[in-house]
C-alpha cells in the first residue's frame, strides 16, 4: 500500500507562500487571486478564486483586518479565528492538501506571518446557472454545453466542476 505524505503548514511564512505560489498557477491564471495585506504589522497573503467569493463579505472582513494593531494580534491562528474574524464559517487548516482543496472549491484562504496554520473562510457564492446548450448557436453534433456570461462567471462554472490547480 502506497501512503501519500501530506505536507503540513510550517512556521516559515515565506516557505508556505512559496509552496502555494508553486502549486497554484497564480501568474498564469486570471481568476486565481493572490492578495497581499498587512494585518497587525505582519504580512499576510490571501488566496481565492474570482467569481466564487461574495465581494461584500470579503470587503467587510478585510476592512476589519485593517483595524487590528500589533498589540491586538493573537499569537496563534486558532485564537485569531475566534477573536478577529467577523464571519461564521471559519476553519483553521494545517495540511496543504486541505488548503488547496478549499481554495479550488471556492473558499478564501489566508496565511499570516508567524502562524503555523492557514485560516479558511467560506464566503462562497456559486454561480446559479447550470451549463446548458445556448439558445442561439445550437450545434447538431458534439457537446451541448455553452457559455453565455462573462469570462469570470464562465470559469467559475467550470471550476465548480473541475477542481484542479492545472486548470488555467
Question: Where are the language model's segments positioned?
Answer:
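Membrane-embedded alpha-helical signal segments
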Residues: 1-168
Amino acid at each position: 500500500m502506497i501512503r501519500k505524505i501530506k505536507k503540513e503548514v510550517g512556521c516559515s511564512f515565506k516557505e508556505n507562500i512559496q509552496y502555494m505560489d508553486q502549486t497554484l498557477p497564480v501568474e498564469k491564471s486570471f481568476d486565481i487571486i493572490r492578495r497581499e495585506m498587512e494585518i497587525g504589522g505582519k504580512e499576510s497573503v490571501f488566496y481565492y478564486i474570482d467569481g466564487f467569493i461574495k465581494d461584500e463579505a470579503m470587503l467587510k472582513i478585510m476592512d476589519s483586518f485593517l483595524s487590528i494593531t500589533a498589540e491586538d494580534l493573537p499569537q496563534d491562528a486558532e485564537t485569531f479565528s475566534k477573536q478577529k474574524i467577523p464571519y461564521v464559517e471559519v476553519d483553521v487548516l494545517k495540511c496543504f492538501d486541505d488548503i488547496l482543496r478549499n481554495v479550488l472549491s471556492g473558499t478564501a484562504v489566508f496565511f499570516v506571518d508567524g502562524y503555523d496554520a492557514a485560516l479558511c473562510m467560506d464566503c462562497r457564492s456559486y454561480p446559479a446557472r447550470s451549463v446548458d446548450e445556448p439558445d442561439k448557436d445550437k450545434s447538431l453534433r458534439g457537446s451541448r454545453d455553452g457559455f453565455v456570461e462573462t469570462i469570470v462567471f464562465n470559469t467559475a462554472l467550470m471550476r465548480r466542476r473541475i477542481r484542479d490547480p492545472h486548470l488555467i
